[in-house]
């Protein structure tokens, strides 16, 4: 079985399956690497409203709202996420870079 921790030092360092490349008061640029363990992409809720723009996406990355079918992520896709709305990512090939706008 693949041990993703050996390949994904960001998870070991931050405890999160991503790296924040840029953080401002208005937005975060976040990268999910190609070697993350898919089990780390869990259902969760955020404490604020957000819009998420896909900057770069490898093949097959998906976003899913609770009780909805997953949506394929492609560059320039924008997703709105309400405060405390359940959602998750599904791992694809390559990396995923998102711009998360705080509302």
List each model region and its residues.
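Fe(II)/2-oxoglutarate oxygenase catalytic core
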Residues: 2-4, 60
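Transition segment at domain starts
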Residues: 7-30
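Conserved short histidine dyad/triad with adjacent acidic residue
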Residues: 26-48, 80-83
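Short, conserved beta-strand element in jelly-roll/cupin
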Residues: 46-62
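Short acidic, glycine-rich loop/turn motifs
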Residues: 65-67, 102
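Short acidic-glycine-tyrosine-enriched beta hairpin
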Residues: 67-84
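Ligand-binding loop in jelly-roll beta-barrel domains
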Residues: 82-103
